[in-house]
Structure formats: C-alpha cells, structure tokens
C-alpha cells in the first residue's frame, strides 16, 4: 500500500505544468518574530559565492524558483521589473534557482524571458528547501536589513504592482508587515 501511495505522489509531481504551490496555502505569512536563516551555499552564474552575507544591511526579497515550475517562471518578469524599480530605494531582489542544472538552467530561462535586471543566483547544493523550510515553489522570503526572515509569500505574486511595491517600501522603511499588505497572486500565463 505504501508503494502505491508513493507512486501516486510521484506521478502528481511529474504532471507537466504543475508547480508545488498548487498543493499549499498561498499568500503572505508574517512571522510573529524575525527568524534567522540557516547557512546555504549560494553561487552566481560564474560559480562565485553570492550568499546572504553579501547583502546584509539592506532588506531583501529572496524568491525560490525552478525552471520546471510554471508559476515560478511566470513570476520572473514581475520580479525583474520590481528589481529595476525598488533596488534604487534600498532593497535587494534575489531570484534563487533551485534547478539541478544550476546556473545553466537559470541563464537559459532568463534569456528566453528576456530578463535584464535579475542576476543569476543558484542554490549550489540544492538544500534551500530544507534549510529554509520551503516545501513548495514558488516561495518568496522577505528579509529585514539584519538578514532575518520577517515574512514569506507562498505562490506566484504580482510583485511589480502597487501592492507589491508598497510591501517592499514598508520592508525598506522597517515598518511592521501585515498579511493584508500582500500583493495579489499572479495570473497564470500560457507560455511563460
């Protein structure tokens, strides 16, 4: 019986177009107290270290995504536009690729989508899900200037809209975040 259950679960994950987020509660979840992040080996597309310690002192949005996750890929253009708009105001926008193919997959996806502003960041050891307690993709972590997680958004969001911008400005200003500040879920696209 356990084998059948395992095979059924494995089959559900293999269905094309299904991201993990469809199986979890979606939206903004604000922590009662900031949470420290575990250690993770993050690299840029040249294989150089690009971990969280490289941007401490600024609040950050860290989006965990994979090229096989359609909602993740559909969300990337909004994150690209958000980065261009909000980084000059003092926040970092990081798209952390969790693909097995690493930087190659991220570079190819960014090229296909004409992503201009996001930099390639890769979970080199593919442990982000475990280290950050992220069971579904896409998941976005919101970090304060001390590098502590204050909230997370589960599912694809319209980050470049007015609510996404307002949420990021509240994070930059070190104001308390509340669930009603959540940007809307991104609308699915047929060919991200």
Feature-to-residue mapping (PLM):
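Short active-site neighborhood of thiol/selenol oxidoreductases, capturing the structured segment around
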Residues: 53-70
């Amino acid at each position: 019986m356990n084998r059948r259950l395992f095979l059924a679960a494995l089959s559900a994950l293999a269905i094309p177009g299904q991201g993990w987020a469809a199986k979890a509660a979606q939206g903004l979840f604000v922590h009662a107290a900031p949470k420290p992040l575990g250690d993770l080996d993050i690299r840029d597309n040249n294989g150089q270290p690009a971990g969280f310690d490289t941007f401490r002192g600024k609040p950050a949005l860290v989006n965990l995504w994979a090229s096989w996750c359609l909602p993740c890929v559909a969300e990337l253009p909004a994150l690209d536009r958000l980065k261009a708009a909000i980084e000059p105001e003092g926040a970092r926008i990081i798209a952390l690729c969790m693909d097995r193919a690493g930087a190659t997959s991220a570079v190819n996806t960014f090229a296909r989508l004409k992503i201009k502003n996001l930099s390639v960041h890769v979970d080199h050891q593919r442990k982000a899900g475990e280290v950050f307690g992220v069971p579904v993709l896409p998941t976005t972590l919101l970090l304060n200037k001390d590098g502590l997680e204050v909230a997370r958004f589960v599912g694809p969001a319209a980050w470049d809209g007015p609510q996404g911008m307002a949420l990021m400005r509240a994070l930059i200003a070190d104001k308390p975040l509340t669930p009603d500040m959540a940007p809307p879920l991104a609308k699915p696209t047929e060919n991200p």
